[in-house]
Amino acid sequence: MAAALPPAIFLMGPTAAGKTDLALALARVLPCDLISVDSALVYRGMDIGTAKPDKAVLAEFPHALIDIRDPAESYSAAEFRADALAAMAESAARGRIPLLVGGTMLYYKALLEGLADMPSADPVVRAELEARAAVEGWEALHRELAEVDPQSAARIHPNDPQRLTRALEVYRVSGMSMSEHRLRQAAGNPEGGTSASGQLPYTVAQLAIAPAQRQILHERIAQRFQAMLEQGFVEEVEALRSRSDLHAGLPSIRAVGYRQVWEYLDGKLSREEMVERGIIATRQLAKRQFTWLRGWGDLQWLDSLACDNLPRTLKYLESVSILK
């Protein structure tokens, strides 16, 4: 008889939904190790605009995969998968439960399904890229491609939107550049593909938290952005801008909120425009996260405003045999 797989918990949801609060509540009563699933929290020195848990919280409840990269560096879904699997294995080896919390849905997908050798088209990612091109121009997207896949950028002209979109789409969906995919295919190396090795060796309980009404989430997003500004978000971005190795084309600086504050400091936006666009960009991020979650199977939904989320979650975890 095969041994039972160790348990793990995924706590997903849109930005500003209350994921961290519930994760901390669970960590207070369960033998959990927290693992961040957030593409912005990996960066050091980016604390306010990412709503990173403060030092006191991190001292009491350490989170794996927070502050593991400098903002000048990139971090892919493939790197996340390797790092998260290592953190989960370490947690399980101690007889504890890995609790993964965050809103970067591509990372969860990479964990559950592995990384395809060459991904198929993703209409959500493609629509996002085309919408950005309509606002920023294809030159901006070509500069982004040059950051993550300079070999493809050298081959693809900025005025070739079809190939440019595809190259960026491959990177966004798989976490690897198109050039890296081609090298692996040429070498006949299936590592990272969706074979049996891509299956996650855990019994996973998948939770999602969000307000029942979308308008409430929009209000929370606006309130949180204003609170970030009061906490020194602009000054945080000023400190990043003072570094000669950082620029607006880097993945870290393209993070929601940071890009808008950077443009404000560049004189491209007024303060009012910066606030408005920052809030709108955060709402658009939440919409994309909801799009992912709507297509997600086997989710237990929780209302952010409910008073009984902790006992409801514990009861659910017992029902799916995560807790014995």
From Swiss-Prot:
GO terms for biological process: tRNA modification. It catalyses: adenosine(37) in tRNA + dimethylallyl diphosphate = N(6)-dimethylallyladenosine(37) in tRNA + diphosphate. Substrate binds at residues 15-20. The keyword Methyltransferase does not apply. The record marks 104, 126 as: Interaction with substrate tRNA. Keywords: ATP-binding, Magnesium, Nucleotide-binding, Transferase, tRNA processing. Pfam families: IPPT. It comes from the Bacteria. ATP binds at residues 13-20. GO terms for molecular function: ATP binding; tRNA dimethylallyltransferase activity. It is an enzyme of class 2 (transferase). Its EC number is 2.5.1.75. Its cofactor is Mg(2+). Monomer. Belongs to the IPP transferase family. Catalyzes the transfer of a dimethylallyl group onto the adenine at position 37 in tRNAs that read codons beginning with uridine, leading to the formation of N6-(dimethylallyl)adenosine (i(6)A). This is tRNA dimethylallyltransferase. It comes from Ectopseudomonas mendocina (strain ymp) (Pseudomonas mendocina). The gene is miaA.
